[in-house]
Amino acid sequence: MASQKPHLNLITIGHVDHGKSTLVGRLLYEHGEIPAHIIEEYRKEAEQKGKATFEFAWVMDRFKEERERGVTIDLAHRKFETDKYYFTLIDAPGHRDFVKNMITGTSQADAAILVISAREGEGVMEQTREHAFLARTLGVPQMVVAINKMDATSPPYSEKRYNEVKADAEKLLRSIGFKDISFVPISGYKGDNVTKPSPNMPWYKGPTLLQALDAFKVPEKPINKPLRIPVEDVYSITGIGTVPVGRVETGVLKPGDKVIFLPADKQGDVKSIEMHHEPLQQAEPGDNIGFNVRGIAKNDIKRGDVCGHLDTPPTVVKAFTAQIIVLNHPSVIAPGYKPVFHVHTAQVACRIDEIVKTLNPKDGTTLKEKPDFIKNGDVAIVKVIPDKPLVIEKVSEIPQLGRFAVRDMGQTVAAGQCIDLEKR
C-alpha cells in the first residue's frame, strides 16, 4: 500500500556542477534508501574513473552515458519519506541543452530545492537565474535554497561567504516573485546540515535541509477539476495491454472510468492503475501512475496526448492567446516566428501570428499596442497558431495545463501562459 503521508513532488534545480545529484544521493543514502555497500561500490568505480567525489551523484545518474560525462540527462525519480511527507525526488539536469527536460520536469513539481554552490567563483549564475525563473513561470509554488559546497569555501564553512551568496539569491528570487524562501548552508558531499545539524557551522541556527523540506505546505489537490493526465510514455505490456504513464495534474482517475485521449481522439476503459508498482483504487493530482486502458493500441496514443474523462474532454485548440515573457532570444521576435512550444508533455511547433501588445512587467499595464517586434525582457500578449492539434487549457481554469516554455536554437527563448483559446 502506498504511504498514507501527504505526497509531494520535489525537484532539485540549479546550475550544472553545483552539486544537485550529489545532494540527492546523500539525502537518499541517509534515509536508508540506498544500502552502504552500493555507495561503496560507486565510490570505487568513481575513483577508478578519476571522478573521486561523484559516488552519491551516481545514485541518480543511472544511465551509463551520464556516468561517463558526469552530467544528468533525463529526469530521474526516486522516493523517500520524512517525518511529515512522502517525497518523490526529481533530479533535473543542469546543462543548457537539457533545459527542455527541466521544463517537462518542473511542471510536475510541488516544491523545489534550488542548489547554489558557495565555492568562490560559483554562486548565482546564469543557469541559476534561468532555472529559478522557469520554476516560477511554470508554477512551482515554494522553494528552499540549499547553499552547497560549504566545505569548499575559503576558509571552509565561511559564514561571510554564505551571507554573500544568500543575499544574491534572495535578491534574484524576490525579483521574480518567490515569497516564502528558506536558506540552508550545506555540504551535500560531506553531509553537513542535510539531515543532521553540522558541528562545522556553529554560527548557523536554522533548520537542516530535511527540516526545511518538512516545513513545505501541501498544495491543495485540484480534485474537483476535470481529469487531465498528460501522457509521458506509452508501454505495451505482455498479458496486460496498453499502459500509458503520466502524472495526474487535475481530477481523479478510477478503474472502470471511460477516458479519451486528445488530440489522438482515442477512447478506452481503464482496467487498473499502479503507482510505484502498487495497485491504486484511485489516482489523484500529483500521482505519477501507469494505467492499463482497454480498447486502445500502443501506437494509437503518444507522449503529448492528454487523457481526460469522456464528458469533460481535454481542450484541443486551433489558436490561443498567451502572455509571454521573452527570456533569451539573440535578436527580436516578430509575427511569423515559429519556435517549438513545450506545453505539459507536448512539443509542437507554433507560429506567433500577432503581437497584440506589450505590457509593463511590474504592473501589467499596456505599454504599446501592436508593436512590430518584441525582444529580451519584454512581456507581451501574443496570438499563437499551432502547426498541428494541441491540448492546452486557460491558465485561469486549469493552470497545470496552461503554462508553457518556448524553445528555439537549443535554448528557452520565452515562457508564458495561455489566457484565452479558440477550440478546434
UniProtKB/Swiss-Prot annotation:
Span list, region G5: 187-189
Residue span of region G1: 14-21
Coiled coil: none
MF GO annotations: GTP binding; GTPase activity; translation elongation factor activity
Region (G2): 70-74
Region (G3): 91-94
Signal peptide region: none
PROSITE patterns from the UniProt entry: G_TR_1, G_TR_2
Record localization: Cytoplasm
Major location (coarse): cytoplasm
GO CC, one annotated term: cytoplasm
Pfam families for this protein: GTP-eEF1A_C, GTP_EFTU, GTP_EFTU_D2
Residues annotated to bind Mg(2+): S21
Region (G4): 148-151
Residues binding GTP: 14-21, 91-95, 148-151
EC class of the enzyme, as a word: hydrolase
Enzyme Commission number(s) from the entry: 3.6.5.3
Catalyzed reactions per annotation: GTP + H2O = GDP + phosphate + H(+)
Record keywords, A-Z: Cytoplasm, Elongation factor, GTP-binding, Hydrolase, Magnesium, Metal-binding, Nucleotide-binding, Protein biosynthesis
Chain ranges of the tr-type G domain: 5-223
InterPro entries, alphabetized: EFTu-like_2 (IPR004161), G_TR_CS (IPR031157), GTP-eEF1A_C (IPR054696), P-loop_NTPase (IPR027417), Small_GTP-bd (IPR005225), T_Tr_GTP-bd_dom (IPR000795), TRAFAC_GTPase_members (IPR050100), Transl_B-barrel_sf (IPR009000)
Similarity field: Belongs to the TRAFAC class translation factor GTPase superfamily. Classic translation factor GTPase family. EF-Tu/EF-1A subfamily.
Protein's job: GTP hydrolase that promotes the GTP-dependent binding of aminoacyl-tRNA to the A-site of ribosomes during protein biosynthesis.
Cross-referenced PANTHER family: TRANSLATION FACTOR
Protein name (database record): Elongation factor 1-alpha
Lineage: Archaea, Methanobacteriati, Thermoplasmatota, Thermoplasmata, Thermoplasmatales
